[in-house]
Amino acid sequence: MGVELGSNSEVGALRVVILHRPGAELRRLTPRNTDQLLFDGLPWVSRAQDEHDEFAELLASRGAEVLLLSDLLTEALHHSGAARMQGIAAAVDAPRLGLPLAQELSAYLRSLDPGRLAHVLTAGMTFNELPSDTRTDVSLVLRMHHGGDFVIEPLPNLVFTRDSSIWIGPRVVIPSLALRARVREASLTDLIYAHHPRFTGVRRAYESRTAPVEGGDVLLLAPGVVAVGVGERTTPAGAEALARSLFDDDLAHTVLAVPIAQQRAQMHLDTVCTMVDTDTMVMYANVVDTLEAFTIQRTPDGVTIGDAAPFAEAAAKAMGIDKLRVIHTGMDPVVAEREQWDDGNNTLALAPGVVVAYERNVQTNARLQDAGIEVLTIAGSELGTGRGGPRCMSCPAARDPL
């Protein structure tokens, strides 16, 4: 009998975590497509893999079972023919490719073994990589495309497993991701949870393909209390729909909708604040005095949405504590901005008072240590080119309950 899956906090001892080791999908990045694929540079892939291996080894050394998304995907494709059909259907963009090419591509993908199919579903495929016997005389799309263009687009953001599935209590949320470059990620996590034997019997919470919610915006502040950032990725409609779904399933009694700036540096709530202990949060200094929250609560008569209030006060009230301790990165403004950009506030808690952080954020880490938080550092010079830190790169599937 394995560990019971589920999580009701950000800081309970981490028992099972889903990661994605970066691979061939990062080698698809070029100066022409980095903006489209949401990267700020071209990572040195082998170094990024070394950094990720260090991260995975650290989590394992602290007692977490590390599940790799590519392994889960391959195993699900091997286990289920329905999984294969689901993955192929999501990857073949018939409106863009046209019916003749879509049919030929689908037939080719059906011929692949599970490992090779998993590779194509994550790394993508160019027109040059189509089988040599693909008919060119029936597809204008094939005739007119440049050989290096993608017939299946790669998923370089898969490394950020936080966004495409969220465990809340014993259930998993498969959200709708906001940007085109990431939409298919959710289809792969959906496939894994639906068809991998490890997740047999796991029930879903909140499934939407219309109102975007991303996992980086969802923080489990305490049992029954969920904060949802509303900004560049998660919409107000998505936050409200998630809240109502959690109430209906008795997974939360309070949801805090937290407006954040609609800019890349603050794309998710966890880029400006994360929990580091049961009553303690690290927060970007520039938002400490301005971050607000709308409290959404379930009542006997339905759902009420309160007026905006200071976030720390609203959070403490919902959590049932006197005060939320905030460790802010209130150093030199230039250093604070640099370290926020480098995911200094994007920590991953392994247990109450124990977090993983990028080593490069020296001053933020020092402030955490001065406040009594144990900080375990990892390298991230290459992993950080996609604008994500340790929390972004991890999907906790099981934590000890608080």
Swiss-Prot record:
Q: Which GO terms describe its cellular component?
A: cytoplasm; plasma membrane
**What does the UniProt keyword field contain?**
Arginine metabolism, Cytoplasm, Hydrolase
GO MF terms here are: arginine deiminase activity
What SUPFAM superfamilies does the database record attribute to this sequence?
A: Pentein
Query: What Enzyme Commission number(s) does the record list for this chain?
Result: 3.5.3.6
Q: Which reaction does it catalyse?
A: L-arginine + H2O = L-citrulline + NH4(+)
Q: Per its UniProt entry, which superkingdom is the organism in?
A: Bacteria
The annotated active site, in chain numbering, is 392 (amidino-cysteine intermediate)
What coarse category fits the chief subcellular location reported for this protein? cytoplasm
Compartments where located? Cytoplasm
**Its GO biological process terms?**
arginine catabolic process to ornithine; arginine deiminase pathway
EC top class named in words: hydrolase
- Which family is annotated? Belongs to the arginine deiminase family.
> What remark does the entry add?
Was identified as a high-confidence drug target.
What HAMAP family does the record tag this protein with? Arg_deiminase
- Report the protein name in the record: Arginine deiminase
